[in-house]
Amino acid sequence: MDSNTVSSFQVDCFLWHVRKRFADQELGDAPFLDRLRRDQKSLRGRGSTLGLDIETATRAGKQIVERILEEESDEALKMTIASVPASRYLTDMTLEEMSRDWFMLMPKQKVAGSLCIRMDQAIMDKNITLKANFSVIFDRLETLILLRAFTDEGAIVGEISPLPSLPGHTDEDVKNAIGVLIGGLEWNDNTVRVSETLQRFAWRSSNEDGRPPLPPKQKRKMARTVESEV
């Protein structure tokens, strides 16, 4: 096993522990708490994949961080912070909408890279809006936290979420996953719209209905892909 992989996991475990202590003092805002919860799932998946105990890794990560801080000057810290571009966290959904449980009558699921696409194929003839919470850097989607499909009545009928055991995805990965979700939902004559935030940072183009322009041929192909591969 690569030593950098192990040490990276150890540092991530310790930093998560620090953030958890911060949250326990009721100091974290909603985006902070959301990332904390999802990073916990990711660390559990990575720990299982690597065969490493999280508690032991956390202690080792503390030693690594302490050693770095001992060598770090205030001036170097200022330069590092100034040179790192800041990302923004954008929210279409409330914390309640993100954490709400939902159920599928005819479940369909597809894994595309490090993203999991889920949808209820029993939904027909509905107006559906895609909403997402994600981070943006350089005016492009950086990391998808969660995307969900809502009917006008507020029911959740689809979802795209990162797999905890496979961290890392690009904006193109997200765009392709959204295309698969839209294709599957439109197969049952649903009308799908994309939120303005997603249009701006993930699609960069849309038609008058507020959804990405997908040719009918491509739409049918993606819908068949969902049915054949799930």
Curated annotation (Swiss-Prot):
Motif Nuclear localization signal, residue range(s) on this chain = 34-38
Q: Where is this region: Disordered?
A: 205-230
Provide a GO biological process annotation: symbiont-mediated suppression of host type I interferon-mediated signaling pathway
Segments of this protein annotated with the region RNA-binding and homodimerization: 1-73
GO CC annotation: host cell cytoplasm; host cell nucleus
What post-translational changes are documented for it? Upon interferon induction, ISGylated via host HERC5; this results in the impairment of NS1 interaction with RNA targets due to its inability to form homodimers and to interact with host EIF2AK2/PKR.
Q: Where is this region: CPSF4-binding?
A: 180-215
Record keywords: Eukaryotic host gene expression shutoff by virus, Host cytoplasm, Host gene expression shutoff by virus, Host mRNA suppression by virus, Host nucleus, Host-virus interaction, Inhibition of host innate immune response by virus, Inhibition of host interferon signaling pathway by virus, Inhibition of host PKR by virus, Inhibition of host pre-mRNA processing by virus, Inhibition of host RIG-I by virus, Inhibition of host RLR pathway by virus, Interferon antiviral system evasion, RNA-binding, Ubl conjugation, Viral immunoevasion
Chief localization:
host cell
Name where it's found: Host nucleus; Host cytoplasm
User: Pfam families, per this entry?
Assistant: Flu_NS1
Locate the motif Nuclear export signal.
137-146
Output the Gene Ontology terms for molecular function. Answer: protein serine/threonine kinase inhibitor activity; RNA binding
Transmembrane parts of this sequence: none
Stretch list, region PABPN1-binding: 223-230
Q: What is known of its domains?
A: The dsRNA-binding region is required for suppression of RNA silencing.
Q: How does it assemble?
A: Homodimer. Interacts with host TRIM25 (via coiled coil); this interaction specifically inhibits TRIM25 multimerization and TRIM25-mediated RIGI CARD ubiquitination. Interacts with human EIF2AK2/PKR, CPSF4, IVNS1ABP and PABPN1.
Q: Which family does it belong to?
A: Belongs to the influenza A viruses NS1 family.
Task: Say what the protein does.
Answer: Inhibits post-transcriptional processing of cellular pre-mRNA, by binding and inhibiting two cellular proteins that are required for the 3'-end processing of cellular pre-mRNAs: the 30 kDa cleavage and polyadenylation specificity factor/CPSF4 and the poly(A)-binding protein 2/PABPN1. In turn, unprocessed 3' end pre-mRNAs accumulate in the host nucleus and are no longer exported to the cytoplasm. Cellular protein synthesis is thereby shut off very early after virus infection.
Protein name from the UniProt record:
Non-structural protein 1
| Gene, per the UniProt record | NS
